[in-house]
Every structure is written in structure tokens, then in C-alpha cells.
Amino acid sequence: MPKRADIKKILVIGSGPIIIGQAAEFDYSGTQASLSLREEGYSVVLVNSNPATIMTDTEIADQVYIEPLTLPFIKRILRKERPDALLATIGGQTALNLAKELAEDGILEELKIELLGTKLKAIEAAEDREKFKQLMEALKEPVPESRIARTLEQAVHFADQIGYPIIVRPAYTLGGTGGEIVENSEQLTEVAKNGLELSPVTQVLIEKSIAGYKEIEFEVMRDGNDNALIVASMENFDPVGIHTVDSIVVSPVQTLSDREYQMLRDAALKIIRALKIEGGVNIQLALDPDSLRYYIIEVNPRVSRSSALASKATGYPIAKMAAKIAIGLTLDEIVNPVTGTTKAEFEPALDYVAVKIPRWPFDKFAEADRELGTQMKATGEVMAIGRNFETALMKAIRSLEIGTFALDDLTYSDLSNQDLLNRLMPATDERLFMVADLLRRGITIGQIHEKSQIDEFFLDKILHLIEIEKELKMHVLDFKILKIAKENGFPDVTIARYWQLEEKELRHLRKKEDLFPVYKMVDTVAGEFSSKTPYYYSTYELENESLKEKRPSVLVVGSGPIRIGQGVEFDYATVHCVKAIQKAGYKAIVINSNPETVSTDFSVSDKLYFEPLTLEDVLNVIDLEKPIGVVVQFGGQTAINLAGRLENNGVKLLGTSLKDINRSEDREDFNQVIKKLDLSQPFGKTATTVTQALSVAEEVGYPLLIRPSYVLGGRAMEIVTNRQDLSDYMKRAVKVSLKHPVLIDSYLTGREAEIDLLSDGQTIIVPGIMEHIERAGVHSGDSMSVYPSQYLDQNVQEQMLDAAFKLAKELHTIGLMNVQFVIHEQQAYVIEVNPRASRTLPFISKATDLPLAQLATRVMLGEKLADLGFKSGLMAPKKLVYVKALVFSFNKLPKVDSSLGPEMKSTGEVMGVDRNLAKALYKAFVAAGFKVHEHGNVLFTIADRDKKEALALAKRFDELGYVLWATAGTSSFLHENHLPVRQLGKISEDQLNPVTAMRQGKLQIVINRLKTDEPLESDGRAIRAAAIENGVPLFTSLDTVAAFLQVLESRSFNVSAINKGDKS
């Protein structure tokens, strides 16, 4: 079937900011799909609100809009661009919901815009719980007994009929948002009410729980000719009851008999054909481990995180194929880009095992509920490939970057056998390590299976790893055991620990015994056909399929899994680095472990190694490829932390030298740099013991900003105001030592600003100065930013530029550097320098239209900025205003406090662009999910220290016509200052209080400033939690409130009586 000739222009909707449930996989799929459509000759218009993506680069689509993903803005773009068709299946749940809204609005029909790929009817049949159930019943495909509830009363009634336990599943939500397994009616009341509020169609499914069944997934493709195939089969290590994104997942399936596999495969193919989906779909099924009974759990009629995993696990580019199917091509017409010879209709065949392990944010949020269930909590994931399950699992464990290299890196000696068994259910993020520890103690596979419902096949594989552990400890320096361990994924660092050697010594021993990994190709055809993919994984076998070319190469170290503090912006930088290396004539090699990202698309680089980002795994690739240099500037703290050990092993690092990286990262060395350059810096010292920290604090003076050295995303950073707080922090948050001192700084209040600069050692260019909206004390990664600067005076800007230039020269910067300042009493103080690409790089690159990562790479490869037409200095600002706003995922982590401070908490970002600040702010707030009401009720609950500042803001709300509500202390203060205010009671009281007011929909905005000594169980914390739970815009920084007021004021008209006041 030839591709469609009746359409010329296609609008592609992206997925917006990174949140828990919707991460970098949609940048990968959106980029793939857009390029695929352009490859076929179509004009592509792309809209997304997230600047930290490759898909919003101007070369990805013919027209790129960075605008809020809301109905009004999409409609404006549709009217302006007049596309012939709309593709909404590669932008996650956000794009699907928008497609539904656009169709219901009538604009698609009005402008004669066709929905490509999966039609609205199919989307509704898969997403609407009632229609899905009806379709499954018509197909005679079993679904768990369930009822649709549209009210709380219906939910309770249906649950009583079905019987507990039940699963509550809200319709049209993302990542299982609002979903939960419920044991009783009291729990149901809370969960169902929340689910109905979260569902855009006010609908929840009350479903009989089948927790404990095996969870199986199929990624399925279908074209317009009804050709369909299974791209990948995936099995969850964890049984039904844990969201698949929070499960360890294995591909291909491991424990099914041929009969079971064919039965489920047939069901999946029957469903995609019945839905008439054209493109890709993810189908989740539950199989009774003791019979052939199975149930259909759900169908995702779009590209998903599982699709990205399946694409990387098999090499089959699902989003690319889905885009081609959407414009009319059929699977038997599309060439498989992996082989270059076979067609896309052939099902991939795997001669290896891929394992995915989720990356959770619990290292950042100690107070978070670690229990795993039907609502996802992972921010990202890693994938590893091996010849067997054991190898892939061990490689995935060390890819997580949580300090674990093997199964014995987390043990539970403080727990008895029974206590540890009991901890298996409900499951937490540590269950895998708990299982290993139980097996180590001699607890049987049967006992663990009975408690956890994890299949005995997987438990037996873990036991095999425990047995190898024991053998290694018993047979020190035994080469035979070493070989077995390496064939099963054990890293050098773990074996060296067992044998009481340094890692370097074990590496030398391996080399002496000629024990090296070889690299096998991921080819989709299990070696049956020749393949041209440059996509490899390591294994300890004989034949190496990755052959070194004569052309000189450069290795780029990726950034690993998405987590808070290190997001998709670093993958953006990695991809741009690769492009520049290729343009310079070198072979670009990428090593990374993240299946969601564009950098791990095999078509991006000349060679891709899907490997953990550890010293051993990176050195193994370097030994084979012998690159002319290695780039660590774009992989965030992950790559920077490898720099020293790589150089110590004789690796040449491109860009800023290791010595100068360390001078910027090590506090004492950096203090000497600041002193030498005569720059201003908050007074501070380091401490290596608790006693020393208390002594330093007295010298520096409270309040203090405390943080460990060498951290990412402000982890374990805190503002303390007294000796007791400091003592508690030192005991709770950090492991202080001579090697890892704690930094203790005077906390200066003031506006923050930052600079990203580019230097070749001679010419230094500054694209722009970014000014933060929130003052010092809120982590820079959580602070809204504005470019160009709006409020910094010329003198302050010159101070910043002078300091940045001096630092770049003194640190011999080759490439990128990020410098952060606090402006205190018109003096610019240097607070931090990052000798690498920072998380602001995509934002400033998009705002200035300057490919900074590519330019930095060219500089690292020896080019001079002067030869490229640049002169030292600050570049002329753009005429538009650009605002970066942050997005948080507190609704997925209900026990995490939503107040902002020096510890980073955001998961993603959006950008607002317009001709003036107020309009750009409006777009940024809307894109970040804030509801902008022209009037309503605003709650003030303010700590004493902030009341005076809050008063001015309250007056502005009053002028706009907002009704002021407040808690007792704040209410008295506002009343004393002659403002009308309604007082609310304490949460413990029966009268109307902030929490019940929010639940009743009576509050449109909540402004909460916490006290410095606020206890965990406080009204303030409960108010913040209720705002998140009820979707009420919450502000914990008065600076953000002022910016929001600027938006409200710009959108309202002033009304005043002409006879008001004295005119004389």
C-alpha cells in the first residue's frame, strides 16, 4: 500500500515535561517519529513544552513550537499551521488526552484535520474502562470482574458486591496515577475519591484484585492491511500488583511454556486487530501461575515506556515504524533498518536476555513511602543485556548508580529471618536485595516464593548468583571460578573485595590470564541474517563482533538513568556532542545504560555500547576501541565522577583537565582559587567530623547552608538555623569523613543568577545571564529562570561576567562551565562552579539559538572560537523573553514534603516564550500545570518571619478581587493591617479548615511558608499535602507568588471609581 499522497503536513504532539510516569522515552519516540515522517517527504510541525529535548531542536521538524500543551494553545497552532493530519500516539498520555479534547472541541472536524495512526474510537475503546471491558467481553477475552464507578457511593457499592481486595484504576490517567490495591471500605473511600478527582472523565474502575499472577507484556505492531506482529515479549519479575514501570522486567519471557506463550500471543494479536490500531500498542496480561487461566489487564494504544524498552531490547525501532504505518505504509513494505535487507514484518528474534531495573528517587527522599504498588514511583530505569539472566541482572544492578555493584551490597543483618521474610510483602525497592539475603541465609526458594509470589525460576537464578558468591569467597585467586563469575556478570570491584585486592590489581590479573569481554551485536534476527547495526553488549565468550575501524574515534560517556538532579538535559547534551564529533570527521562512540533516551538509539552514533557506566565497563570499551579521547563533560556527575579514575588508567580526557575539574569540585582547592582571584564568596569552611562542624558553625555564624562535597542535585543539602538542627543533620544526612568533608557556608539571602559559558582557553563567550525568580535557598534546579535578565542592574551583571571570565581562565576551561551567583546587597558572590554541561544547557541553547554542546565539542577537538567567528564577551540578548519553570511529581510521592529548599525535588521543566515577561511567565505557569484563575479564594498560611513581605502580596490579591482566607495567626496579622480575611480553623478542629476547604473545592491558590523548626506532623505539612492531593496550585516561595501575581495582573483590567479619593 503506497504512502498517503493526500496529506502534506502533519502536526506531532510531544509529551511535555519529565514527570514520574512520563520520562525521556517520549523524547526518543518523538524524535524517531518526526525524522521518520520527514524521511518520507512530509512537512512536520512539532509542539512540545519541554526545552530539554532533542525533539524540540529545529532540525527535527520543519516548524517547532515550544508552547504549553493545552487545548487553547494547540488550537492556535492548528489554526496557524493548518496541518492535514495529527499524530498523537508518540506523546504519551498527554498527547492522547489532547487528541481526545481536540476531537470533542470540534476543531479537527472544522479544519478537516485527520487523526493519524490509532483512531479516536480505538483510543476510547482502550482508555475508557467501560468501553474496554465491553470490547473484551465481545471478543470473549477474560478481564478481572469489575465495575465502572462515577461516584464514591457507586465505588463502595460495587466493591461490596465484588469483594475485597480490589484494585482502583482511574480512567485516562498516567502511570497508574491514583490507582491502588484496597483492602477495606475505609481505605476505598479515600482512594476512590482521589481517583475520581484525578480522572479527567471522573471515572474509576473497581476491579477484583489478581495480585500474585504473572504479569506478561507484549509490544505489538499492526498496519492498515491488518498485518500484525509481536515485537517483544516481556515478563515482569514482580507479579501483578506492582506497576510494570516499577517492576524488574525481562525480555524475552522466561517462564512460559510454549502453550502458554502462544495462548497469550494469540490474545494480544486478536486485541490489536479488534481495536483496529495502526501502529504500536502495549498489551498487559495476567497469567495464573497454576493454570491456563489468564486476564487482560490493560491496553496502551500508544508508544509507552515499555515501547522504548522493547525497542532497545530488540533493536526494532517501534516509534519509527509506527510513524511510517500512520502515513499508510505496510509492514511488508518497510525495510528493517537494523538489517537493511529484511522487512519490518519479521518478528525480532533474541539470542540474549535484556533486564530492566527501575531507578527510584528514594535516595533523594528519605521520607518517601518506599512501598511499591499500582501507582508508579520510578523516575527512570536502566537496561542491561547478557547471554543469560544472571549476567543481565548483575549488569543492571551496577548500572543503577546507587552504590550497588552486586547482590550483597545491601544486606539486612539487623533483621531476623522472619522479619526479613515479612518485609517481602508489601514490596519495596529493596526487595531484590532482600531475596538475595534470604537465600544467602539458607531460606528456601519455596518459602520465598510463597511470601513474594516471585516465580521460582527467577529465585533459582538468584540462588545461582549467591552460590557463585560463596565459591569466590572460598577459592581466592582461582582462575576457573573467576571465569565463571565473569560469565555471570560479576564485576571486578566485587570480586576484588572478596579477594581483598584493589580493583586495579584484579583487572591486571584478568589481563594476565587473557580474560576479556567480547562484544555481540543486537541485530533483531539472532544472527540469522547479516546486520549493519552498530549496537553492542559485552559477554565473556570467544568471538568478538565489534571490530575496530581505522578511522579515529571519540568516546562519549552518557549520563545513565533519569533521576532527580540528572535528567534528560544531559542526554540532550550527549546527542549534540555526538553530532559535532561526526561533523568533525571522527567516529562517535556512545556508552550508556538508559533505554529511554535518544543517545541509546543506535542510529544516532557510529557505535553504541549498551553497558553500565562503571570504571570497568568503560575501560573495557576503551581497551577495544582505543579512542583518541574521552568526553565526560556531557554526562552530568556520573561522567565527572569517572574522570579521575579514567585518567589514572591512562585515558586521555578531552576538554578541561582533571586537575582543574578537581580544583572546581574540591572545596579547599576552590577556596584558594577564589582567594587568588580576589572574588566574593559566602564565608564558609569545611568539616570532617561532627565536632569540627559544630565549631565551624560558631565561627561562620547562623543561618548556615550545609552540604556534602561532590554531590548532584543538592542531595543532602539543608539550611540550618541553630546548633541542634546542625547536630541532627550531621547524624542523619551525611557520612562525614576526611575523604568526604561537609561544606558549611554562611547563608546569604538574595536573588540568584547563573551563567553558562564556553571557552577555548583564549576566547570566552557568554550566551546570556539567567536570573532566578526564587531567591537563594531554593535549589537552582528547582528555581524558575528568566533570560535575558530583567532586574539585575548593569553593575551586578558586570561583576558576574568579570568573575566568570577570571574563573574560566584560572581553571583553564576548555569547553563548558556553569557559574552560579547569589546577589546580596548589590554584590555578586560566587556560590558554585560546575566544570561541565549543566542542566540549564538546553534552555539557554534554545533561548539563544546557539548549539552550545556542539560548539563545546568542536573546541575540545581543537577548533578555536575566533576561527568560528566568535569574540569574547556577553552575546547580545534576544528580543523575546524566555522563562524556565519546573515541574514536580509530588502526587506520585505523597509522603514527600513539597516545600522547596536547597535539596532538589523537580523532575522536569517547561519553557514559556513571549514578547514580554508577564506573557512568558503565563505560558510557563500554564505549561507546568498551574491553573490560572482570574478570581477565587487564596489561602495564606505564613510563618512570622515572612508576614511583612506576604502583606504586600495579599494586598495585590485583594486588588484583583480574590477573597483572602488565612489560618489563625496570619488572619490576625492581615486583619490588623485592614485587609478583609476569612479565618480557617486548625486541622484538628471540627470547623472549616484548610484541608476540608480544599477537598470541597473552595480554594484556588494556597500560599504556605513553613516555619524553620516545623515538625513532621504539622498543620503546614498537612496543608501542603492536601494541596498536592487536590490539585490546588501551591506556592512555598513568596518570590514565585510575586511572579504569579504579575501574570494575574497582566491579564486583568483595572477598575476604579472616578470619584475615589481626593483629586485635588
Curated annotation (Swiss-Prot):
The keyword Manganese applies. Its cofactor is Mg(2+); Mn(2+). Mg(2+) 3 binds at residues 820, 832. Keywords: Amino-acid biosynthesis, Arginine biosynthesis, ATP-binding, Ligase, Magnesium, Manganese, Metal-binding, Nucleotide-binding, Pyrimidine biosynthesis, Repeat. Residues 133-327, 671-861 form the ATP-grasp domain. Mg(2+) 4 binds at residues 832, 834. Mg(2+) 1 binds at residues 284, 298. It holds the Pfam family MGS. Mn(2+) 2 binds at residues 298, 300. PROSITE patterns: ATP_GRASP (PS50975), CPSASE_1 (PS00866), CPSASE_2 (PS00867), MGS (PS51855). Binds 4 Mg(2+) or Mn(2+) ions per subunit. Pathway: Amino-acid biosynthesis; L-arginine biosynthesis; carbamoyl phosphate from bicarbonate: step 1/1; Pyrimidine metabolism; UMP biosynthesis via de novo pathway; (S)-dihydroorotate from bicarbonate: step 1/3. ATP 2 binds at residues 707, 746, 748, 752, 777-780, 820, 832. It comes from the Bacteria. Residues 930-1064 are annotated as: Allosteric domain. Mn(2+) 1 binds at residues 284, 298. GO terms for molecular function: ATP binding; carbamoyl-phosphate synthase (ammonia) activity; carbamoyl-phosphate synthase (glutamine-hydrolyzing) activity; metal ion binding. GO terms for cellular component: cytoplasm. Residues 402-546 are annotated as: Oligomerization domain. The keyword Magnesium applies. ATP 1 binds at residues 129, 169, 175-176, 208, 210, 215, 241-243, 284, 298. SMART domains: CPSase_L_D3, MGS. The large subunit is composed of 2 ATP-grasp domains that are involved in binding the 2 ATP molecules needed for carbamoyl phosphate synthesis. The N-terminal ATP-grasp domain (referred to as the carboxyphosphate synthetic component) catalyzes the ATP-dependent phosphorylation of hydrogencarbonate to carboxyphosphate and the subsequent nucleophilic attack by ammonia to form a carbamate intermediate. This is Carbamoyl phosphate synthase large chain.
